[in-house]
Amino acid sequence: MLRQDAPGEASYWERHRIDHEPDMNITSVLQRMAANAETADGRPVTPVAYDCNCLEEVCGACTMIINGRVRQACTALVDKLLADNPAEIELRPMSKFPVIRDLSVSRQRLFRALQKVKAWIPADGYYDMGGGPRQAPEEQLEAYPLYTCMSCGCCLDACPQYTKVELTQHDGESAAEFAAREKAEFDRSFAGAHAINQVQYYNSHPTGKMQADDRLEAITSAGGIQDCGNAQNCVAVCPKEIPLTTSIGKIGRAATLYKLKKFFGG
């Protein structure tokens, strides 16, 4: 396991040994490692830090690199991993996000991209406004896979265009100034497939499409869809098998039409 004690510090490898039990997943392995915090040679160490929540591949919290592939720890079954490599299992934190400690990373940039593209439907209040617009069953079937995105970050970690952004607070810089500088850097950097997918989801929704131009403006600004290199790694690693490249293609077309319309004063 690749460990790191704090943000900005050097990482180091550590070997642990866990007794095998049937039907274990990587999250259960990490639970046992944290409960018995010592290396394979018996040296006491600090308990491993990692993120998890739902344990059923819904929340997206437990993303890490397992045997060289970014995926969810809760659905990574030990028996299957050992069948591929009986000698050991290798765990590393995601490579495109700043490490907080060990396998836990900061995904602020991921969520900032969703804010940037307005990945929500605005609500004016909580009054009963009656029935909303209807959506055809065919449209529902097409939209549902896009809705299943759990912001896990797998697509971003596998993307060659999505490079790591890790800033540190300067001497004399206030927390507010640092937050503003970090936000600006996030906005200049590639938003990623997850954000493009959410633009497609909300812009295809009968209510969400009322803010379609706002989302297209955001996704064509700096760090937008024009930075996508079409490597298609995102769709290959998505644990929900979301058709990300289809969303990218549709938003690419919509963005082109939006810009042409804007150029000609439409």
Language-model regions, residue ranges each:
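Eukaryote-biased recognition of intrinsically disordered, low-complexity regulatory segments
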Residues: 1-16
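Ferredoxin-type iron-sulfur electron-transfer modules in oxidoreductases and energy-metabolism complexes
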Residues: 24-46, 78, 87-266
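A cross-kingdom feature strongest in bacterial/archaeal respiratory oxidoreductases
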Residues: 18, 49-50
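Short strand-turn-strand beta-turns centered on an Asx-Gly dipeptide
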Residues: 2, 19, 66-68
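Well-ordered beta-strand positions in beta-sheet-rich domains
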Residues: 12-17, 73, 88, 160
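Serine/threonine-rich, repeat-prone extracellular segments and beta-strand-based repeat modules
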Residues: 51-56
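Glycine-rich phosphate/adenylate-binding loop and adjacent beta-alpha elements
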Residues: 66-91
